[in-house]
Amino acid sequence: MNTWKKELSFIFVLLLVAALTACGSTNEETNGEQSGAGTEVSEEEITIAQINWAENIAVTNMWKVILEDKGYDVTLSLLDMGVTMEALATSEIDLSLEIWLPVQDANYLETYEDTINFSESTWFDNAKVGLVVPTYLEEVNSVEDLNEHKELFDGEIIGFDSGAGTMEVTEQLIEDYNLEFELLPSSEPAMIAAIGQAIENEEPIVSPLWSPHSVFSNYDLKFLDDPQKTFGGVEKIHHASRLGFEEDHPEVSEWLKNWKMDDEEIGELIDYVESAEDPLDGAKEWIEENQELIGEWVK
């Protein structure tokens, strides 16, 4: 049973290698481009953290295109969430475009509220987080059902990046519900691959997941009820910047505050980025087709 689990570690390694080359412009690529252009640092350089999550890859590439069209030199630096927060706090990077509040990233807000500027503005207002299972598991509809079906899942919740706020909340959920389960970290691509493999074999799997996410277009999944509201209700997505960024780049800061997307817009952007051979090309195509929306942000 659960034959996909034997392949999970191998999938994780392959996807981690692929992520370093498939997530658009990275720090390594940009450094290579700059090495032949001298060592002078432009005041218009901006470094944005990129996390290997579908929506994060989409919006970071989107903003790279938008800002470079405006004359900025943008580097996307591939990091995990914990390193991103530390890098913002020490001003090693300028921006993180994905902070989920009030629940998922509350721990980061509490830890870094004096050393990072967490914007009150939001760019997505209808996000949801929880545990998901395939819809064919008709007997499992609530987190409270999991212990009863522990053997079905081998007592495992298949997770993603260990430093992510949602993973920390999932650990809290295990405690709140006294679940006899272990949370297994991997990466988002490895987790999605595991979900796909399980569904292909009509096997059980339970994982923490969030919406918006393109996986819901590919597989029939359902969120489990969370009576204790450990995952909270509706989440909103903010951005964060290093201290002093607003003073250094007031125009960009204003554009980010104007940034708003709905389910259809972010879903379409993710589709364009994931369908393109180069994520940056997908972002460019989407931007070309949504000039009116972009104009509302950068006015």
Regions found by a protein language model. Name each.
Residues 128-138, 235-248:
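A bilobed periplasmic-binding-protein/Venus flytrap-type ligand-binding module shared by bacterial periplasmic
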Residues 24-43:
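Short, low-complexity, disordered segments immediately C-terminal to signal peptides
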Residues 93-97, 162-229:
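Ligand-binding pocket segment of bilobal, Venus flytrap-like solute-binding proteins
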Residues 18-22:
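C-terminal motif of bacterial Sec signal peptides marking the signal peptidase cleavage site
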Residues 60, 80-114, 193-194, 214-219:
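Pocket-flanking alpha-helical
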Residues 40-55, 72-77, 154-158, 256:
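Short, well-ordered beta-strand elements
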Residues 53-54, 75-87, 184-194:
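Short helix-initiation/N-cap motifs at beta->coil->alpha
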Residues 114-162:
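A conserved helix-loop-strand patch within extracytoplasmic ligand-binding domains
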